[in-house]
């Protein structure tokens, strides 16, 4: 992986295998690997090769990262820990693929625009390349038991008024249903989440169009909660806790196509500044303000993503040679460097454990109570899961206070460190 210091970061599949227990202990139930396909001979030089996003062979592993056996071990070990594994698929551009798929399909490499950007310079033409990428999407599931895909610049597969994710997702769904009918546990989820960088309206007419994809990253939610992707001039929450109310409403209420789609909320990804960069290290509530953002993640209905290193408040501003789309690609580590990082890690693990064991956290119907306690602003989010009777409270405050909660009582909250309370345990 090419990083902001102008050098390789030397990460590999073995390093991920060695990190699985750490990831599991954070409360995660899935891993997204940025591209691991062979890019070692890709066009454009080593900086493009090292990103992984310009592959030269979709059916081989980049030797810098390891081998197919390493991937198989990683997937098997993740599954032993009840974690899914998602690969990163770049199905709209590549770095000079010349070999056919195992079934003999090829890519039409004509320089091609797309419905979002007719002047784009993708080098995958649809529908001519459709069979090739249907095979990529299904081959890794059927041969390596992966559980789904993160899809880079997914809008590039929307061409000539047609959303070709409809066919690719259909192929994945059919395979996963077949594998499930055969009694297989893994390689049956078929989760596919698209990167269609924009607001809800952009995604609706892009990868969600005509039911192509069912999940896409929630860029609008990310920027509202934790600030811009490629600037650090705002930490988000510019409208106070009202922005949290907005983020926790249903997809339709936030402008998405309908409530069957699944926006995926995140606070950092590999294309922008890290969450911690938006906060002043000298702020006495530096770590707690990040806890607030992670509490929003934990309370979000639908899928969420946590970027490696954010559990330790890793930063990027100190790096050199960085561009806005690579500053977050920093070297990973598995241990905190100070007590603040240790406390943040522990907080995240705790609230994610509560999310995992309380369905109200990830699918419950929310009620909101915005209030003032003296000079302190507070927000109470009550979430109830109808199927299990599970009920939880998430209480936010911008100062130390006791927040009066309807039908519960007073909740002591430290500034910017939300409390998550299980009011009623789920009955399954």
Regions found by a protein language model. Name each.
Residues 1-145, 167-172, 177, 202-203:
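Substrate-binding/active-site clefts of carbohydrate-active enzymes
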Residues 2-15, 278-287, 407-408:
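Short, polar loop/linker segments at the starts of domains and inter-domain junctions
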Residues 28, 145-146, 213, 302-303:
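A structural motif
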Residues 31-33, 85-87, 149, 192-194, ...:
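Hydrophobic faces of well-ordered beta-strands that scaffold small-molecule active sites
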Residues 35, 87-94, 153-155, 194-197, ...:
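A cross-domain feature marking catalytic cores of carbohydrate-active enzymes
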Residues 79, 135-136, 142, 152-259, ...:
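Active-site-proximal helices and loops of the catalytic beta/alpha 8
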Residues 268-274:
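Active-site neighborhood of divalent metal-dependent phosphoester/pyrophosphate hydrolases
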Residues 297-312:
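Conserved short secondary-structure transition element at the edge of the structured enzyme core
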């Amino acid at each position: 992986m090419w990083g902001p210091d102008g050098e390789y970061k030397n990460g590999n599949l073995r390093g991920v295998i060695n990190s699985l227990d750490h990831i599991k202990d954070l409360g995660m139930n899935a891993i997204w690997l940025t591209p691991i396909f062979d890019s070692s001979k890709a066009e454009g030089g080593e900086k493009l090769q090292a990103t992984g996003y310009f592959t030269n062979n979709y059916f081989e592993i980049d030797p810098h990262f390891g081998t197919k056996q390493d991937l198989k071990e990683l997937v098997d070990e993740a599954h032993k820990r009840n974690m899914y594994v998602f690969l990163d698929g770049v199905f709209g551009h590549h770095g000079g693929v010349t070999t056919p798929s195992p079934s003999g399909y090829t890519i039409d490499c004509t320089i091609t625009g797309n419905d979002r950007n007719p002047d784009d310079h993708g080098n995958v033409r649809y529908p001519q390349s459709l069979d090739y990428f249907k095979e990529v999407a299904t081959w890794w599931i059927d041969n390596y038991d992966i559980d789904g895909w993160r899809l880079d610049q997914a809008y590039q597969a929307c061409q000539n008024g047609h959303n070709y994710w409809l066919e690719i997702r259909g192929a994945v769904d059919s395979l996963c249903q077949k594998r499930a009918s055969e009694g297989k546990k893994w390689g049956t989820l078929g989760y596919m989440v698209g990167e269609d960088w924009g607001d809800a309206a952009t995604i609706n007419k892009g990868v969600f169009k005509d039911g192509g994809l069912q999940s896409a990253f929630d860029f609008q939610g990310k920027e509202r909660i934790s600030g811009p992707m490629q600037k650090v001039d705002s930490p988000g929450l510019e409208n106070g806790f009202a922005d949290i109310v907005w983020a926790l409403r249903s997809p339709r209420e936030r402008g998405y196509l309908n409530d069957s789609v699944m926006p995926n909320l995140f606070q950092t990804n590999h294309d922008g500044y890290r969450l911690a960069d938006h906060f002043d290290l000298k702020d006495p509530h530096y770590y707690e303000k990040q806890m607030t953002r992670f509490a929003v993640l934990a309370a979000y209905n639908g899928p969420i993503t946590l970027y490696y290193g954010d559990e330790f408040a890793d930063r990027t501003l100190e790096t050199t040679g960085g561009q806005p789309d690579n500053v977050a690609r920093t070297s990973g580590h598995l241990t905190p460097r100070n007590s603040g990082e240790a406390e943040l890690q522990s907080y995240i693990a705790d609230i994610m454990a509560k999310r995992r064991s309380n369905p109200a956290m990830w699918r419950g119907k929310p009620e909101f109570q915005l209030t003032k306690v003296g000079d302190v602003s507070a927000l109470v989010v009550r979430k109830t899961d109808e199927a299990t009777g599970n009920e939880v409270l998430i209480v936010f405050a911008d100062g130390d206070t006791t927040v009066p909660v309807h039908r519960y009582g007073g909740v002591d909250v430290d500034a910017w460190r939300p409390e998550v309370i299980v009011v009623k345990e789920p009955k399954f």
